[in-house]
Design a protein with these regions (language model features):
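Acidic, proline/glycine-rich low-complexity IDRs
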Residues: 2-126
Length: 126
C-alpha cells in the first residue's frame, strides 16, 4: 500500500468534497478539531502511538499530508506533496525536532494548509 493508500476514510466513494483527515495507529478522524490534533500529538509524545498524520484531501494545497514519527523527545516531520503536484514523489522532512517544533508545524498546516519553512526541509524521493 502506498502512502496515500493509508488515507482511506469514511467519506463516500467518489466524494470529491474537501476534508481534513487525522490518522494514527489507533484510528482516524474525518473531521478533526485543533484539539483532536493536539491530543494525537500528545499520544505520539508519550509513546502511545507510532505516528500521527494530518491530510487535507480534495483541496487545492501543495502539501497534502504532514506526518510525524519519533520518540523520547526527538521527532521527524514529513511533508508529502499532493498527487497532482509537480513535486509528487518527493518527501520533505525535518529531523531532530522537539515536541514544540513538531506542534508548530502541525498547527500551521492545520490552520493554513501550508508548511512554514518548507524550503529549509531536506528532500528525498519516495
Amino acid at each position: 500500500m502506498g502512502i496515500f493508500g493509508m488515507f482511506k476514510s469514511n467519506q463516500p466513494a467518489g466524494d470529491e468534497n474537501p476534508y481534513t483527515l487525522l490518522k494514527m495507529k489507533q484510528g482516524s478522524n474525518d473531521a478533526p478539531t485543533i484539539d483532536d490534533m493536539y491530543k494525537a500529538l500528545e499520544l505520539l509524545e508519550n509513546g502511545q502511538t507510532d505516528y500521527v498524520s494530518l491530510a487535507q484531501l480534495n483541496q487545492e494545497v501543495d502539501i497534502e499530508v504532514v506526518q510525524a514519527v519519533g520518540e523520547m523527545g526527538m521527532f521527524t516531520v514529513e511533508a508529502l506533496p499532493s498527487k497532482n503536484s509537480p513535486e509528487k514523489g518527493k518527501i520533505y522532512y525535518k529531523e531532530h525536532l522537539d515536541e514544540y517544533s513538531m506542534q508548530h508545524y502541525f498547527h500551521a498546516y492545520f490552520e493554513t494548509g501550508k508548511v512554514k519553512g518548507l524550503e529549509s526541509f531536506e528532500v528525498r524521493k519516495s
